[in-house]
Amino acid sequence: MAASTMSICSSACTDSWRVVDCPESCCEPCCCAPAPSLTLVCTPVSCVSSPCCQTACEPSACQSGYTSSCTTPCYQQSSCQPDCCTSSPCQQACCVPVCCVPVCCVPVCNKPVCFVPTCSESSPSCCQQSSCQPTCCTSSPCQQACCVPVCSKSVCYVPVCSGASTSCCQQSSCQPACCTASCCRPSSSVSLLCHPVCKSTCCVPVPSCGASASSCQPSCCRTASCVSLLCRPVCSRPACYSLCSGQKSSC
């Protein structure tokens, strides 16, 4: 076979991964076995008529524009390889969900618009989160073992606590009942679209009701200027519910 066909000899040959004339028994399909000296552009056209090579896939609309952005040992995915990657050296052996556009798949080492990772590549057990894969993540070490609701980061996706908290969770209007034990005091930068879920860990006690009372517990509640007006606990003891103005509550 002529070297112009870009066939690549397999490891069964004497000199592995060479672009040379080699026998049929050790010839790999064109553009399917990357070598450091090759530009990884999947356009198998010269292999069609060769008995030593088989085309990796049928020509497609996106094939001509597919160029790998990965390093040499990285697993690649394209429209001619529809099976998604299960692990990739580029992603530290993580299971990598991919966002596939109809007809043409996006390479896993690129970062398309709808593919948002929740953790860095340095974490060996990280998982990736994407708005195209709505049930991808269950827990991630980068989020301190918190369950991360899958909701595209927008005006309605506002974290309530910092990543340093081991019991933190994320809260958003897309997942209104997300938090179980998280601070419910939104700051001025929090969107009003985000309805906080109040729990006792961050609530403000009412002095007249005792230290154990909390604004998030229905027995004794208080609304403060720092607490969102959207968060309104139900009070079972009306006399104990005082507004900022000092008036009694009607609840």
UniProtKB/Swiss-Prot annotation:
Restricted to a narrow region of the hair fiber cuticle, lying approximately 20 cell layers above the apex of the dermal papilla of the hair root; not detected in any other tissues. Sequence repeats lie at residues 26-30, 31-35, 52-56, 84-88, 94-98, 99-103, 104-109, 126-130, 136-140, 146-150, 168-172, 178-182, 183-187, 202-206, 220-224. In the hair cortex, hair keratin intermediate filaments are embedded in an interfilamentous matrix, consisting of hair keratin-associated proteins (KRTAP), which are essential for the formation of a rigid and resistant hair shaft through their extensive disulfide bond cross-linking with abundant cysteine residues of hair keratins. The matrix proteins include the high-sulfur and high-glycine-tyrosine keratins. This is Keratin-associated protein 10-10. The lineage of its organism: Eukaryota, Metazoa, Chordata, Craniata, Vertebrata. Keywords: Keratin, Repeat. It comes from Homo sapiens (Human). It holds the Pfam family Keratin_B2_2. The gene is KRTAP10-10. Interacts with hair keratins. It comes from the Eukaryota.
